[in-house]
């Protein structure tokens, strides 16, 4: 189970199931979630999560994430993407705020 502070800025390298997103959005009262996916995944997630202002979806891959440096306090890596960590480590660390953490989701999405 992932633990978040209310003000965390979380990057998800894949879009999890809607119930997980809802739980995150409610926990991150003053924070935010940005999740990466394919065009179809992003369109579906945007439709499903329209009521939440603190959740955003980007059509992007973990190899090249269109976001500013040192923004996220947590980067969540699902198990199916762990094998990419050596290749995407520089990109993840570019986005990670000082003191931020990279965490394994523990569940594949």
Q: Model regions: which residues?
A:
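Conserved alpha-helix/loop element of class I SAM-dependent methyltransferases that forms part
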Residues: 1-9, 19-23
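Glycine-centered, small-residue-biased loops immediately flanking beta-strands
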Residues: 8, 31, 100
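A short acidic, Gly/Pro-enriched loop at the edge of an enzyme's catalytic core
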Residues: 60-75
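A short glycine-rich, Lys/Arg-flanked "PGG" loop and its adjoining helix->strand segment in the class I
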Residues: 86-101
């Amino acid at each position: 189970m992932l633990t978040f502070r209310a003000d965390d800025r979380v990057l998800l390298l894949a879009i999890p199931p809607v119930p997980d997103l809802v739980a995150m959005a409610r926990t991150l009262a003053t924070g935010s979630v940005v999740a990466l996916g394919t065009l179809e995944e992003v369109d579906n997630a945007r439709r499903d999560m329209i009521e939440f202002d603190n959740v955003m979806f980007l059509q992007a891959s973990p190899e090249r994430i269109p976001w500013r440096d040192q923004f996220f306090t947590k980067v969540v890596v699902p198990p199916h993407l762990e094998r990419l960590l050596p290749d995407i480590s520089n990109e993840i660390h570019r986005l990670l705020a000082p003191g931020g953490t990279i965490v394994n989701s523990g569940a594949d999405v």
